[in-house]
Curated annotation (Swiss-Prot):
Component of the thioredoxin-thioredoxin reductase system. Participates in various redox reactions through the reversible oxidation of its active center dithiol to a disulfide and catalyzes dithiol-disulfide exchange reactions. GO terms for molecular function: protein-disulfide reductase activity. This is Thioredoxin. Pfam families: Thioredoxin. It comes from the Bacteria. GO terms for cellular component: cytoplasm. The keyword Transport applies. Keywords: Disulfide bond, Electron transport, Redox-active center, Transport. Residues 2-107 form the Thioredoxin domain.
């Protein structure tokens, strides 16, 4: 299992929207093959940007309200939030370099 903390519908506002740091949210599900492929990349990003970016995962099967609120149609979807607003997103299993360069714009 991933070392990246999980958030839920109930904790999303506090953990993501109210965060002082930019937040990368990995919308995923256990049955999703590409989600499993991108999980190690998300964990590496979490370690690489520790203290600069908060990285969390949201299981879309267990937390459909938040996924629906942000129009998640396919997973994995990686969304970046800053100041309580969605500022960017990357859909699909992407290389670490793609994810890192997207994140860098918001640091």
């Amino acid at each position: 299992m991933s070392a990246t903390p999980q958030v839920s519908d109930a904790s999303f506002k506090e953990d993501v929207l109210d965060s002082e740091l930019p937040v990368l949210v990995d919308f995923w599900a256990p049955w999703c093959g590409p989600c499993r492929m991108v999980a190690p990349v998300v964990d590496e990003i979490s370690q690489q940007y520790e203290g600069k970016v908060k990285v969390v995962k949201l299981n879309t099967d267990e937390n459909p309200n938040t996924a629906s609120q942000y129009g998640i149609r396919s997973i994995p979807t990686l969304m970046i939030f800053k100041g309580g607003q969605r500022v960017d997103m990357v859909v699909g299993a992407v290389p670490k370099t793609t994810l890192a360069s997207t994140l860098e714009k918001y640091l």
